[in-house]
């Protein structure tokens, strides 16, 4: 976990629990998993979306329902349940200039009054993964840095080429020459184009 600066070595400690829209009526998230007592939810956004915490409430509700059912937990009993801690990260790589990190809160969506306090909160940490942002994170996760380089390269070629397909193709060639995402781009070239 680069964000928390933790390194998990045992793959058996990882339980992927990504929501698929087949079961949840068009509700899916990019990736979610349990590891180290944390329910991790990761989303990718190419546009700024201040409503991510509301989506997070929906996702976490479903994820915790699944967790309770899978572990045969009694939500009606007198014993307090022990649940994994939720962590919600949104990776942003849109063209609008945003800070390296931003906290998005569900409570910011509520119709506010001075004397009322919400009984519900969900916080998403939005991390800007555009090239040049979050240098420490990029240094710790080379693959993410290479992705940021590739996206920047595509955007540069979009200024020069007539079609998106040409821009992506030239960006792929340039990145492969520079040893950026080389294995992925060679293997998935047809899918990327």
Annotate each PLM feature.
Residues 1-193:
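Elongated, amphipathic alpha-helical interaction scaffolds
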């Amino acid at each position: 976990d680069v964000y928390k600066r933790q390194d998990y070595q045992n793959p058996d400690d990882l339980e992927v629990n990504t929501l698929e829209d087949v079961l949840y009526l068009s509700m899916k998230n990019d990736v979610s998993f349990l590891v180290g007592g944390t329910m991790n939810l990761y989303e990718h956004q190419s546009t700024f979306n201040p409503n991510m915490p509301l989506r997070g409430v929906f996702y976490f509700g479903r994820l915790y329902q699944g967790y309770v059912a899978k572990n045969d937990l009694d939500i009606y009993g007198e014993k307090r349940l022990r649940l994994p801690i939720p962590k919600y990260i949104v990776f942003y790589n849109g063209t609008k200039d945003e800070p390296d990190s931003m906290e998005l809160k569900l409570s910011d969506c509520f119709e506010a009054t001075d004397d009322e306090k919400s009984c519900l909160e969900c916080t998403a940490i939005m991390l800007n993964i555009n090239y040049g942002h979050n240098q420490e994170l990029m240094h710790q996760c080379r693959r993410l840095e290479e992705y940021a380089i590739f996206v920047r390269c595509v955007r540069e070629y979009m200024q020069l080429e007539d079609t998106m397909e040409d821009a992506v193709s030239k960006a792929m060639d340039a990145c492969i020459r520079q040893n950026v995402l080389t294995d992925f781009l060679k293997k998935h070239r047809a899918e990327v184009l």
